[in-house]
Structures are given as C-alpha cells and as structure tokens.
C-alpha cells in the first residue's frame, strides 16, 4: 500500500480508536453526510456536548467524525448509526439518546467481521483493539492477523451469520464491525444487540471514489 493510501485508509478507524490525524477538505465529502452531521450536532448540543469541529474527508461520503469539548467524539455512518467515544476517565453525558452506541477509550475487544477493515487496523498498528475475528487463522491473507490468531491475541468467533455468542458475550465484546452481508441476517443483528453487543456496519464498498473506500 503506497504512502497516500496509508494516510487515507484509516481515517474512520482513527476516529474509532481516538488516534490523532487530519484530512484535507473536499467538496465531494459534503453531500450525503451533511444532513447526518447537522442532526448529530443538534442532538449533541442538547446532551451538553460543545461542538468543536469535524474530521475533514477528502473522498469518503458515508461516514463522519465530529469533535466535542473534553475529548468526546461522535462517529456517524450513512445508516444513522452514532457512536460516542468517551475519553478515558470521563462519564457519559446526561441525556444521551438511547440509540447512541457508547464506547470507552481505550477501545478494545472488537469483533471484526468485515475482513477488508483488518488491513486498516494493521496499517495503524491497532490490531490490539481486535479480540474476535470472523475469519479463521488459515484464511487470513494478512500475516499480522494470522500471527495474532496463532498467538491467541485474536480468537475466531464464527462467521457473520453464525457468531459464537457464548464466546463474545463471555469475553465482553464491545462492538461488532460488520459488512453489508449482515443485512441478509437481521436476526443476528437483533441477537447481538439483545446480548448488549452493539453493531456497526461499514459501508466502504458503497463509496463512489476508489480512495473513498480506503479512507
């Protein structure tokens, strides 16, 4: 992966993990996501969060990252999913909407179903945030992922349509990162959420620009 793609490929993961980054402005990224951002900002102001700015995206249109005073961040995807990142040692703001997913930093114990995202975690040296994989060790083309599974740092937890609920619940999975295939198995999403495991679908495959798919 060339230097430009390395810089772009992980902006959403950067936001998710609370790493430091910046992107360049682009009018291409201000279309479909603008309404979601405005809705998020209105809701978050009501929750006592003070808006400071947003991550500038060059190509991607299907997600947003907004910054708030105190180190809080709100991630949004095109389906309306909102994830609030709470800084270490801080509390969840009062009055937060019941549909907002809350993650505490440092983020850990993720269940990664969307295999294409693994390379982004690798490039950002953030494999330690992943605890569960929907791919078996022998099926990974990414050497670091194979090694992590061989050493037990990442565990196989079943495919998207047949996750090992017992394992991921027992080991306190914090978030399932799915691809669009999960839309064909809504009962799995419902079951995960029933067990208290929030679900986020990554929509990089819908990005119009090739670089938007890796941003």
Q: Model-derived features: where do they sit?
A:
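Charged, glycine-enriched surface loops/patches
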Residues: 185-215
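A short, structured surface patch at a secondary-structure boundary
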Residues: 73-169, 175-182, 197
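Bacterial Sec-exported substrate-binding components of ABC uptake systems
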Residues: 22-118
């Amino acid at each position: 992966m060339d230097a430009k793609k390395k810089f772009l490929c992980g902006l959403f993961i950067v936001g998710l993990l609370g790493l430091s980054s910046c992107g360049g402005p682009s009018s291409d990224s201000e279309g479909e996501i603008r309404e979601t951002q405005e809705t998020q900002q209105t809701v978050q102001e009501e929750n006592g969060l003070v808006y400071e700015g947003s991550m500038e995206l060059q190509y991607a249109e299907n997600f947003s990252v907004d910054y708030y005073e105190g180190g809080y961040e709100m991630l949004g995807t095109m389906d309306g999913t909102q994830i609030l990142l709470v800084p270490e040692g801080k509390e969840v703001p009062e009055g937060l909407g019941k549909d907002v997913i809350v993650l505490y930093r440092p983020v850990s114990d993720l269940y990664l179903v969307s295999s294409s995202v693994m390379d982004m975690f690798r490039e950002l040296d953030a494999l330690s945030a992943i605890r569960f994989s929907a791919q078996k060790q022998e099926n990974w083309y990414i050497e670091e992922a194979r090694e992590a599974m061989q050493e037990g740092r990442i565990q196989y937890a079943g495919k998207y349509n047949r996750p090992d609920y017992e394992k991921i619940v027992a080991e306190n999975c914090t978030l399932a990162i799915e691809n669009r295939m999960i839309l064909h198995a809504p009962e799995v999403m419902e079951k995960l959420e029933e067990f208290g495991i929030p679900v986020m679908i990554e929509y990089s495959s819908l990005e119009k620009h090739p670089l938007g798919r890796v941003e």
